[in-house]
Amino acid sequence: MATNRRVSRVAELIKREVSQMLINGIKDDRVGTGMVSVTDVDVSGDLQHAKIYVSIYGTEEAKAETMAGLKSATGFVRSELGARVRLRRTPEVTFIEDRSIERGTKVLTLLNKLENARSPDDIPSADDSLDED
């Protein structure tokens, strides 16, 4: 069992290397359909499994196509990680679509709509709070 510090260092290293592979290593055209970025990597305590969370910008069809390309490139990514990262055993790689950025954007949009929908009379001013005392 690896220490927490080692697990986090390996996760950061995998994140950096997979990001580099997405830029110029994976030749599958489906991966280039949507703009892809690695948001997080979760490595198991025994360093045998790595969940790679990716954010994909584009239409739903482009996202599905990109995920299919990433799933088919899993073997290539694992072999490249084995060559680039010095570990006794290269972890099994799983790509997972990360929709947290998309959800965060929706929440911010809703909050902005609510703020714009408020009338200026609804917002108490600093003078109103002083008058009550």
From Swiss-Prot:
It is found in: Cytoplasm. Keywords: Cytoplasm, Ribosome biogenesis. Its main location: cytoplasm. Pfam families: RBFA. PROSITE patterns: RBFA. Gene3D superfamilies: 3.30.300.20. Coiled coil: none annotated. One of its GO terms (cellular component) is cytosol. The keyword Lipid biosynthesis does not apply. GO terms for biological process: maturation of SSU-rRNA. InterPro entries: KH_dom-like_a/b, RbfA, RbfA_dom_sf, Ribosome-bd_factorA_CS. GO terms for molecular function: ribosomal small subunit binding. SUPFAM superfamilies: Ribosome-binding factor A, RbfA (SSF89919). It comes from the Bacteria. One of several proteins that assist in the late maturation steps of the functional core of the 30S ribosomal subunit. Associates with free 30S ribosomal subunits (but not with 30S subunits that are part of 70S ribosomes or polysomes). Required for efficient processing of 16S rRNA. May interact with the 5'-terminal helix region of 16S rRNA. Belongs to the RbfA family. Monomer. Binds 30S ribosomal subunits, but not 50S ribosomal subunits or 70S ribosomes. This is Ribosome-binding factor A. The gene is rbfA.
